Every structure is written in structure tokens, then in C-alpha cells.
Regions:
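Hydrophobic, helix-rich cores of sensory/ligand-binding and other regulatory modules
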Residues: 2-115
């Protein structure tokens, strides 16, 4: 399982490289780490969908339609073939999609080496 320590460590390092907010959600769709500390502990509806569904990426142009969601891009975090969480980058989807893909790759790589 994705743990808070790893998620917080990732946010601290990766957050330095982008102006955009990054959120990491656990398997229940709860934000466990974020550049925006006020969001930690909140349920994220789209994260829950992507963790328990089969979508590879979800663009959210209007976050207000969903519980705990702001505009951005959401991707699943996968570890050894299982979805264990989600990572999202807040912003206009066309602007943050590539950043979100890099963040997904980075956290999955970190997760693999640290677990």
C-alpha cells in the first residue's frame, strides 16, 4: 500500500519542480499528501474512480461537479500490477497533462525502489 511517509517525501521533492499543486491519494481516494496542506484528509471523488476503475487518465475541466475536486488531471499509481493510489495535478488539463504523466512515472519509480 502507498504510505503517507513516501507520499509526503515525494510531494516535498517533486513539489519544488513545479508551480502546480500535486495531490496523492490512497486506495480509498483520500488525499494523503499535497502541496496544498488544507486538502490533506479530504475525499477526492475522481481519484476514487480512477483507482477502482480502468481509466488510464482522467481530465477534469470543471472540478466543481465532483466531491473534493478541482480542475486538473488524475492518473492511477500502480505498483506490481495493482492500483494502489492516484496522483493528480491541479490546473487546466491541457497545461498540466504532461506534468501529471511525469509525476506518475516518478512516484511509481520511487515507490518501486523504496518498497
Amino acid at each position: 500500500l502507498l504510505d503517507n511517509f513516501l507520499a509526503e517525501k515525494f510531494i516535498k521533492k517533486a513539489g519544488e519542480s513545479t508551480e502546480y499543486n500535486i495531490n496523492i491519494m490512497d486506495e480509498k481516494g483520500v488525499i494523503i499528501a499535497s502541496k496544498d496542506a488544507e486538502r490533506i484528509g479530504n475525499f477526492h471523488e475522481v481519484a476514487y474512480w480512477i483507482i477502482h476503475g480502468d481509466e488510464e487518465i482522467i481530465d477534469v475541466p470543471d472540478g466543481g461537479k465532483y466531491l473534493g475536486v478541482k480542475p486538473g488531471v488524475m492518473l492511477p499509481i500502480e505498483h506490481r500490477g495493482k492500483r494502489t493510489g492516484a496522483i493528480g495535478v491541479t490546473g487546466e488539463p491541457d497545461e498540466v497533462r504532461d506534468i501529471a504523466k511525469v509525476m506518475k512515472f516518478a512516484i511509481e519509480t520511487m515507490y518501486e525502489f523504496e518498497s
